[in-house]
Amino acid sequence: MELEVFAGQEKSELSMIEVARAILELRGRDHEMYFNDLVNEIQTYLEKSNSEIREALPLFYTELNVDGSFIPLGDNKWGLRSWYAIDEVDEEIIALEETDEEDNPKSRKKKRVNAFMDGDEDAIDYSDDDPEDEDSYEADPALNYDDENPDDEKNEADAYDAEINEIAPDDLDEDVDINEEDDEFSDDDAEGEEE
């Protein structure tokens, strides 16, 4: 295969990405290529060995993805972005999304009727909850606190007493003297400071 674009140029000076672009341009729009076939044709044109191609393959694949002139067409097929108008690319993406939705139909939710809305289409129906809200929250019954249950209050008091006993056990026989008079500060000093 001979590429007229590179006539007179040394093949060893050409990059794989340049050759890929030239090969795809030569083949035309209706002949997009699988990645493996594209690499094989590049290898044939540049007359490189398998080990040279294997070594350059990660960089080539990265350049192919980063270079804005190439477009992945799915199933590891590649083409040139210039072959497709922007609107056409969007249409293909939308068509793929529509087929995905057809494959996985969503279950319909029953419509609730609000008697107070009276057919006012502009009114906001606040009773129409999000699907995430439908999953009800069920608390652990052991954690449920009942105001009328005296056992809850007793358990709470016992837990409080246990915490106090951890800090100051009941068997301490020390007398703690509280000295109400403070030598450094007296009530007279406080009155003098306020004035």
Curated annotation (Swiss-Prot):
Xref: Pfam families:
HARE-HTH (PF05066)
The HTH HARE-type domain is annotated at 14-83
Q: Name one GO cellular component term.
A: DNA-directed RNA polymerase complex
Q: Where is the composition biased (Acidic residues)?
A: 119-138, 145-195
Task: Say which domain of life the source belongs to.
Answer: Bacteria
Recorded family membership: Belongs to the RpoE family.
Alphabetical UniProt keywords: DNA-directed RNA polymerase, Nucleotidyltransferase, Transcription, Transferase
Q: Which GO terms describe its molecular function?
A: DNA-directed RNA polymerase activity
Question: What's the name of the protein?
Answer: Probable DNA-directed RNA polymerase subunit delta
Q: In its keyword annotation, does this UniProt entry include Nucleotidyltransferase?
A: yes
Q: Which NCBIfam families match?
A: RNAP_delt_lowGC
> Residues annotated as region Disordered?
119-195
Summarize the protein's role.
Answer: Participates in both the initiation and recycling phases of transcription. In the presence of the delta subunit, RNAP displays an increased specificity of transcription, a decreased affinity for nucleic acids, and an increased efficiency of RNA synthesis because of enhanced recycling.
Entry's Gene Ontology BP terms: DNA-templated transcription; regulation of DNA-templated transcription
* UniProt subunit comment: RNAP is composed of a core of 2 alpha, a beta and a beta' subunits. The core is associated with a delta subunit and one of several sigma factors.
